[in-house]
Amino acid sequence: QKNKKTTLLPLHENISRDLLDLNAIEYRITSTKVENTENVIFHNKLIPNDYVRIALALPYDGYDIIITIKTFRTGGTDKLLLRYLKGIQQSQPELRIVLLVLEGHHGDWDYLLPDSVDLIYLKNYCYQTYSQQLYNQILERLIVQHHIKILWNFNCRETYIFTEQCADFIRENIEVWGLIFAHWLRPNNLQEFGMAHENLPFVIQDYTKIISDNQTFINYLCN
């Protein structure tokens, strides 16, 4: 028997890890309808919410930075990211970082990440069919739940779209936006180029800081 589709509910920002644990169980035996849904993660009693598995996989309640990247393999972009992460580890070892990878389940360079970085492959935790809406909801909840104030997009198209579709949310919750758009990579089309460059300042015009080049962003973190 196929599980019914899950409807995502707004997540209260003060939800406890104990409640996340409770909602992580795979099956429930009760059919009681819940009326007070403020802290309920999912409607259907058969399916746990994808977000719950991700949140419980992170060992800390609070993080400083979330980095989003499409893939994490062994290419030039991945090498650049590793260098930045190692530099941050050396200069600001107390910063806690979530590296969120959209595609794949593991990578050959996973073991090279500094201790300050917790790695999440989205596909290892998402049982639902992937959609931009689902990604937006997961990213919003991670930011609120873990009190993240720095969003660093490392050449990830889905995060460009997130900044456009959830502009009000990120103005309210994110203090620093960092964009890495590797100069040797070309966007797939003009729309992506616009999201990466031309439209970005309009999306984040109310941010505390607007940082769109690599060196300035690193200098900000180090100071």
Kindly give the residue locations of the regions a language model identified.
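Non-catalytic membrane-proximal stalk/linker segments that position and tether the catalytic domains
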Residues: 1-64, 111
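Membrane-proximal helix-turn-helix segments that form the acceptor-binding/catalytic region
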Residues: 191-210
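A short, active-site helix/loop in glycosyltransferases that binds the activated sugar's phosphate group
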Residues: 17-28, 205-223
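N-terminal strand-loop element at the rim of the active site
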Residues: 4-21, 73-74, 92-130
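Short N-terminal targeting/anchoring amphipathic segment
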Residues: 140-160
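A short, glycine/small-residue-rich beta-strand->loop->alpha-helix junction that serves as a flexible
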Residues: 69-82
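Histidine-centered beta-alpha loop that forms part of the nucleotide-sugar donor binding/catalytic region
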Residues: 70, 124, 155-156, 178-184
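Active-site proximal beta-strand in glycosyltransferases
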Residues: 66, 167-185
